Amino acid sequence: MQTGHPADGVYFGLMSGTSMDGVDGVAVRFEAGKPPAVLSEAFVGFADTLRDALFALQQPGGDEIEREALAANALAARYAVCCHELLRTAGLLPDDVRALGVHGQTVRHRPERGYTRQLNNAALLAELTRIDVIADFRSRDVAAGGQGAPLVPAFHATVFGSPDETRVVCNLGGISNITILPAGGGPQGEGHARNDTVRGHDCGPANALIDAWVERHLKQPFDDGGRFAARGKVDETLLAALLDEPYFRQNAPKSTGRDLFNADWLDAKLAGFQHLAPENVQATLTALTAATVADEIARHAGDCRAVYVCGGGARNPVLLDALATALAARGLDAAVATTAALGVPPQQVESLAFAWLAYRFNARAPGNVSTVTGAAGERVLGALYPR
């Protein structure tokens, strides 16, 4: 039985990030004035063939329309598997779910040209799940002159704000981004995106380069526990060369992705450093992520007392230690922990955010923070594909 806000109910959120290893999903109940209640979670991996196809689509090539359409169909099939697992583990039927918020797989992000492309066949996903699908969240923000990213700060403000301290939520996915939550906020139940004190933007590369390097040299999909980096030593000359990138000097609002920070970018930066052992490069890439995040926090949130990390990088203790060291080196007395310390497992944060954006869509409430993205104002985000 519905109570509270008409949009209240159970929502699914699906997120497949720039690591492209699979899709994380959550089933969550939203009720106005109450914190989100997670009912179940699931992860469904991508086959190497799908992953390779997605990577290939990030660079211009032949027959892109056909390849994109087939990859979108394959993504929808994997997303549907994740949804069926959420239904099973939460003991739900499709009719019990108000909507499914799905991010899709970013293959191009060019807000300066007025578009962003998150691959997914939302119509097929609705057909396979018999659940309303809400997708294409970023395009409306871009249409309003924004970056279309990051979109998670509004959700972060909803669940992670504090009345007593300035907090930073740092997502260490393929790309790193931060949300700055000044003291005086607090968990707000259904949340309010209209908060011009909330700030955030993309910082630079994180697991996109760290994973690419370990896969190249160890044939592993990620640096498990940061062990590869721990074997190496940071090369300060290489680090300086990596930091010599115009994006890092660009003012917010700003966003980035694999369009810039990819293997070609890294190989160009490594010219002249072929003598370095692979583990030293890995240590330096880890230091790059820590340095770029710490620089942005120092620049925009000098009064920060706590940094809460989510995303795949939250499972890398070497990266977390490097971030704490980089913050201290910049004079910040900020503790580093994962969002688990605030009651939300780090692997759930982004998929929860897209479930929340679906909830906001059904409420016809804004999902972006225009001071974060640079959009002309707050907008209802997403497009509906009925069951």
Swiss-Prot record:
Its EC number is 2.7.1.170. Disulfide bonds: none annotated. One of its GO terms (molecular function) is ATP binding. It is an enzyme of class 2 (transferase). It catalyses: 1,6-anhydro-N-acetyl-beta-muramate + ATP + H2O = N-acetyl-D-muramate 6-phosphate + ADP + H(+). ATP binds at G17, T18, S19, M20, D21, G22, V23, D24. Keywords: ATP-binding, Carbohydrate metabolism, Kinase, Nucleotide-binding, Transferase. GO terms for biological process: 1,6-anhydro-N-acetyl-beta-muramic acid catabolic process; amino sugar metabolic process; peptidoglycan turnover. Pathway: Amino-sugar metabolism; 1,6-anhydro-N-acetylmuramate degradation; Cell wall biogenesis; peptidoglycan recycling. It comes from the Bacteria. InterPro entries: Anhydro_N_Ac-Mur_kinase (IPR005338), ATPase_NBD (IPR043129). HAMAP family: AnhMurNAc_kinase. Belongs to the anhydro-N-acetylmuramic acid kinase family. Catalyzes the specific phosphorylation of 1,6-anhydro-N-acetylmuramic acid (anhMurNAc) with the simultaneous cleavage of the 1,6-anhydro ring, generating MurNAc-6-P. Is required for the utilization of anhMurNAc either imported from the medium or derived from its own cell wall murein, and thus plays a role in cell wall recycling. This is Anhydro-N-acetylmuramic acid kinase. It comes from Burkholderia mallei (strain ATCC 23344). The lineage of its organism: Bacteria, Pseudomonadati, Pseudomonadota, Betaproteobacteria, Burkholderiales. The gene is anmK.
